[in-house]
Amino acid sequence: IISYLWSESSDDAAKYNLRFNLWQIKKALVQADGESLLLVSKDVIKVNPNFSFLCDISEIEQATLEDINSIAELKHLLSLFRGDFFENCSLHNCENFLEYIIQRRYYLENRKLVVYHRLIRLTYENALDDDCLQFMSACEEIDPYNEDIAKIRLEILIRRSAWRDAVQYYQMFYSRLLRDVGAEPSPELQELSKQFRLQKTRDVEENVLHLEVCTVPSLP
């Protein structure tokens, strides 16, 4: 803790700062029965196992995300991600701690992506298309090049016969992938795109044929 927060202070000053702040925390976080959040000894600082509390970070870390099949439970976990880790926290001359914050943010963002991916998969498999599309839109803001997500979105649009939307989305995804990553979509995704592009062409031809039939002049 000293190396994170008071690395440039003298040893005596750093230890004093640590003792004072631990005392402040112990005094502030006390249950009705007198139990404090922290147990502090000469050599150890740890969380009191008898102290009852809820912590969003702990809940996110302890969840076995890949094994959760409850959409409601995953939605609850998603609701725990509120802003960045130590958001709006500015600490001067604490480079080690700032590096730790960045690492934790990266870790938590990856956990958030796992939650999104599980929700997308489960809502898709349960034909909850509106929810699935909503989760995909949010997920694409932090994971814009994921072809598995693009494939699910296209399959939903195909299922809805939304050929025009499917073509527009595929073209956007293709352009973004080529521009930002320098790669084309996988052969599987390109093959899938042929389905809705062919269907869109057929729909256009049918509309033209219908227009021609409707505009044939009547015989005298």
Per-segment meaning from a language model:
Residues N21, I152, Y169:
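Residues within the DNA-recognition helix of helix-turn-helix
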Residues F85-L91, E147-D148, S175-E188:
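Boundary/linker segments of alpha-helical solenoid repeat arrays
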Residues R179-H210:
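Interdomain "pre-motor" coupling segment immediately N-terminal to P-loop NTPase/helicase cores
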Residues I2-Q134, A138-D143, E147-D148, D165, ...:
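Intrinsically disordered, low-complexity protein-interaction/activation regions
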Residues I158-A183:
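TPR/TPR-like (Sel1-like) alpha-helical repeat modules
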